[in-house]
């Protein structure tokens, strides 16, 4: 089996004053990534103590660059190069579960990250003469709204589906 944890820090300045505050200025382990690393290191410790009771191989995968949609490619390529694994498990902290509870559902548990880019082109002009311009702003807004409606209109409400357009650059 393969057990994976994301461990990257984020380019966010940690403003709170807590004992576990990042010691590196301008970056922090938000989203629980330090906890993910600790869980996988704890798993490594426990598995090493019961090594003689295991029948099979466990790959512990520490994934970097998860927040930018990268890092997993190397892990997947490695696992394919060894013939694959029977099961892959991803770790993630969840605030809804009580301390000490491990939630291991059958199938996906959280949304994944996938980037996409759409270019809407216009022709500049003055706001007082919209007839002489091609305004890209309103069509771009329409696109965002239509994308956000995909889960409600095109997916079974009993299946999980999240689509989050998160950035517009103009």
What are these regions, as identified by a protein language model?
Residues 10, 17-28, 34-35, 41, ...:
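Histidine/acidic-residue-rich, glycine-tolerant segments that coordinate divalent metal ions
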């Amino acid at each position: 089996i393969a057990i994976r944890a994301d461990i990257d820090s984020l380019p966010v300045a940690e403003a709170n004053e807590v004992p576990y505050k990042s010691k590196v200025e301008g970056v922090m382990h938000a989203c629980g990534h330090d906890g993910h690393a600790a869980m996988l290191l704890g798993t490594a410790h426990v598995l090493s103590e019961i090594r003689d009771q295991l029948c099979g191989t466990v790959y512990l995968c520490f994934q970097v660059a998860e927040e930018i949609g990268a890092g997993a490619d190397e892990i997947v390529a490695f696992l394919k190069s060894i013939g694959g694994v029977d099961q892959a498990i991803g770790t993630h902290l969840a605030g809804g579960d009580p301390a000490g509870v491990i939630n291991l559902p059958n199938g996906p548990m959280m949304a994944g990250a996938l980037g996409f880019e759409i270019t809407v082109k216009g022709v500049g002009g003055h706001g007082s003469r919209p007839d002489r311009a091609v305004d890209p702003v309103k069509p771009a807004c329409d696109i965002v709204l239509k994308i956000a409606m995909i889960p409600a209109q095109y997916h079974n409400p009993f299946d999980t589906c999240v689509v989050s357009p998160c950035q517009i650059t103009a």
